[in-house]
Amino acid sequence: MSTYAIIKTGGKQVKVEVGQAVYIEKLNVEAGQEVTFNEVVLVGGENTVVGTPLVAGATVVGTVEKQGKQKKVVTYKYKPKKGSHRKQGHRQPYTKVVINAINA
């Protein structure tokens, strides 16, 4: 059974495994640098460890592959009979991280 972990980053919880590429909220780290996640909620596998609220001493290490923006989400507001309309777009920034190790 492969080892997995649930980490907290960007206000969300993400399930990760070694070798997996995950898209998370933007981190201020250059592409190619290593990033360590210290907020590990759960480490699963042969022996599952659940944190209260975090697993003590557990870390997840990954390498930043790229920084980017998601596809544009367009919002359009329209008021009938008033000639009023507004169009606005938003592209959420993300960071693609490849998980290298889960240290429990």
From Swiss-Prot:
The keyword rRNA-binding applies. Keywords: Ribonucleoprotein, Ribosomal protein, RNA-binding, rRNA-binding. GO terms for biological process: translation. One of its GO terms (cellular component) is ribosome. GO terms for molecular function: rRNA binding; structural constituent of ribosome. PROSITE patterns: RIBOSOMAL_L21 (PS01169). InterPro entries: bL21-like, bL21-like_sf, Ribosomal_bL21, Ribosomal_bL21_CS. The keyword RNA-binding applies. It comes from the Bacteria. Belongs to the bacterial ribosomal protein bL21 family. This protein binds to 23S rRNA in the presence of protein L20. Part of the 50S ribosomal subunit. Contacts protein L20. This is Large ribosomal subunit protein bL21.
